[in-house]
Amino acid sequence: VKKVEDVADNDMILDVGPESAKAFAMEHDIPRYYESYEALVKDQDVDAVYVATPNTLHYENCRLCLEHGKHVLCEKPFTINEKQAQELYSMARDRHLFIMEGLWIWFLPLYDRLRSILQQGVIGEIKHISCQYGFVATGARKDRKFNSGLGGGALLDIGIYNLGFLRIVTGCDPQNVETTKVHINENGTDDYSCLKLTYNDGCIAESVQTIGEELKRNARIEGTKGSIFLPDFQHAKTLILEVDGKEPETIEYPVDINGFEYEI
């Protein structure tokens, strides 16, 4: 945040552990820190809050912030179900407050170029999209990534990136979503899932996400006139454009800091 121009200062930090909050504040030269959510939202000097608590706390934490007139940037997944999301958006709209899911990949410079390529019809009509993301999650089965009580599982943890990418490409919601394969662990969360998404224009997309296997974070968009391949769609610095009858073109957009600066 301190390296990004024309943004407000980050003057406060909240941590439920007082010692860790103090240590973080001192390390990053933050003058104030809080040990409770209530103390934070009641501070009139706070304009906006970044919520990065466990998944199942997002709804209640965001709601508390909105109730006290704070703008909100909430980490992904925004909530764990649609009902909660709709309630928060309605609250923010009624109170004229800003609220957004913090899916930082939406703001990467390469995706501005990708949108432009697609809007210009360079690869024609999009027919098929595929993306995958996987890694081997470590830790005890009671940890957040495996715990259904904490909103764990592959879909909510990393599948959000896949779905965010599909939204960038299509610009709309799918007409139908089908789970073609899923593995549920002993905690009731998905270690692996494969989704098939169908859109009104006939485009079909496939999304694979797993926290039990290493998968390259690549994606491919197939059109009637060509294709686009992204070797890493999450960090999105490079895409390879192949148009029928032409040599492949590599397009690169490196980030300035770590990628999060564009979201801010």
Residue ranges and their predicted role:
Residues 86-104, 125-128:
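Rossmann-fold dehydrogenase core element
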Residues 105-178, 185-186:
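Predominantly a Rossmann-like dinucleotide-binding segment in NAD(P)-dependent oxidoreductases
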Residues 28-91:
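Beta-loop-alpha module in the N-terminal Rossmann-like domain of NAD(P)-dependent dehydrogenases
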Residues 164-236, 264:
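Contiguous beta-strand/loop segments that form the cofactor/metal-binding neighborhood of enzyme cores
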Residues 235, 247-264:
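C-terminal helical cap and adjacent loop that interface with cofactors, partners, or active-site loops
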Residues 1-28:
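N-terminal Rossmann-like dinucleotide-binding module
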Residues 34, 74, 99-101, 230:
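Hydrophobic residues in well-ordered beta-strands that form the structural core
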